[in-house]
């Protein structure tokens, strides 16, 4: 895939948000997308509108244990750190080493944040960090392009790890996953965010 074409899309996208995006962050994102589009799942980082739609679903006052799946360049991570309680534990999962590096460099001294690679191992990393159950799981994973067995394993791990009143908040670029999520969760609220590239469905799921 031609990074010049992608870069032009991001340039246009940045002006629709009314600001210039961080050059290093976005060029890294573009390169990783061009190399592994199935892993990255999107041509651009999430917009501020999608970020707000996702993270406004979280009860920040009471959320002490949070996991983020598929952190990318850390757009959500950055806002999670801002909003979270001082004593919150945040498990951040990102499989791409270059994107992991960006997140690690941005949050070198956050004592409650730990960085991991494989979201399928969510339960193991919770145990390692002294967490019994999670209050919220925030997901940017591109489930529709992941191997089906991997998607099942990740969703099973999420259901297992959430508190009974916990929420799974995820976005997707199509409604394909809606019926899958309905099989895992008893309740769901859906929101469509037009101001994102591409537009996205936000699913807030709980049991």
Question: Where are each of the predicted segments found?
Answer:
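Core SAM-dependent methyltransferase catalytic element
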Residues: 193-207
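Conserved SAM/SAH-binding beta-strand->alpha-helix loop
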Residues: 96
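A short glycine-rich, Lys/Arg-flanked "PGG" loop and its adjoining helix->strand segment in the class I
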Residues: 152-164
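Class I SAM-dependent methyltransferase Rossmann-like catalytic core
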Residues: 25-58
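Conserved class I S-adenosyl-L-methionine
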Residues: 63-72
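Conserved beta-strand signature within the Rossmann-like core of class I S-adenosyl-L-methionine
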Residues: 165-172
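Conserved SAM-binding loop of SAM-dependent methyltransferases across substrates and taxa
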Residues: 73-85
């Amino acid at each position: 895939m031609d990074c010049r074409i992608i870069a032009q899309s991001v340039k246009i996208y940045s002006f629709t948000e009314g600001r210039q995006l961080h050059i290093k962050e976005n060029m890294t994102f573009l390169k990783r997308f061009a190399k592994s589009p199935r892993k990255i799942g999107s041509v651009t980082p999430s917009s501020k509108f999608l970020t707000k739609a996702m993270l406004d679903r979280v009860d920040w006052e009471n959320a002490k244990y949070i996991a983020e799946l598929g952190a990318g360049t850390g757009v959500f991570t950055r806002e999670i750190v801002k909003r979270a309680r001082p004593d919150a534990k945040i498990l951040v999962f990102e499989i791409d080493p270059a994107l992991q590096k960006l997140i690690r460099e941005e949050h070198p001294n956050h004592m409650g944040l730990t960085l991991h690679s494989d979201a399928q191992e969510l339960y193991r990393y919770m145990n390692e960090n002294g967490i019994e159950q999670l209050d919220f799981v925030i997901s940017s994973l591109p489930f529709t392009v992941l191997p089906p067995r991997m998607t099942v394993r990740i969703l099973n791990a999420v259901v297992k790890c959430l508190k009974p009143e916990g929420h799974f908040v995820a976005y997707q670029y199509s409604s394909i996953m809606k019926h899958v999520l309905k099989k895992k969760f008893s309740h769901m609220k859906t929101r469509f965010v037009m101001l994102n590239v591409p537009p996205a469905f936000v699913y807030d799921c709980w049991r």
